[in-house]
Amino acid sequence: MKFTQIPSDTFSHLQLNAGLMLRDFDPKTATLKGTDIMGATSGGVEFKAKPSYTDFGEDIDNCPANMKELKRLDSIEVTMSGTLVTATAEVVRQLVGAADVDPKDLTHVVPRNDLTEADFMDVWWVGDYSDKNGDKNGGFLAIHMENALSTGGFSLKSDNKKKGQMDFELTAHYSMDAPDRVPYEVYVKAGTDEKAGA
């Protein structure tokens, strides 16, 4: 059938597998450091960048809804959510949001009633992309969230003969230092063939 088809290069443009949450990532080198992995997830990760608009023409006579010249972008809510199944004291601190790790006891996470600059963090999600996924030249799709804060709170659900699960939601935040900068960016890089000896 004429219109029951898919692009011939579909496999070259698929995002594959669950990906990783990272504390840091350089898209220029695409080097993965094990110490940057935040933890193991279950069920993948969901990222959303949801814009909020105002239609200034909605109360104007004879103006149809969604007139593009009268539409204005108010803000963009940027979130990442999922479920972690591994925990360290530092990860729990980040999930609590406003909290510290006790410097005298690095196993002790102490919640606070106020926010500090240290509660906001940059977070990367990076997943395999394209049909070329070798160790050196593999493609990737990467999302960088800036000034992310845990807004979903800290939760732990345990179950008999199962792994404990910690649901999370992170929200990226604008900054007064750069109020026009939307607090996320996306990189889409196709992989290339692995060369012998490269």
Model-derived features: positions:
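Short helix-loop boundary/capping segments
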Residues: 90-145
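Short, surface-exposed, polar/charged, turn-prone segments marking secondary-structure boundaries
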Residues: 75-77, 108-113, 171-176
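Beta-strand secondary-structure signal
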Residues: 79-83, 122-126, 167-171
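Mixed-charge, glycine-accented linear interaction segment located at domain edges/termini
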Residues: 140-198
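Generic "edge-of-domain/loop-turn" microfeature
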Residues: 52-54, 89, 132-134, 150, ...
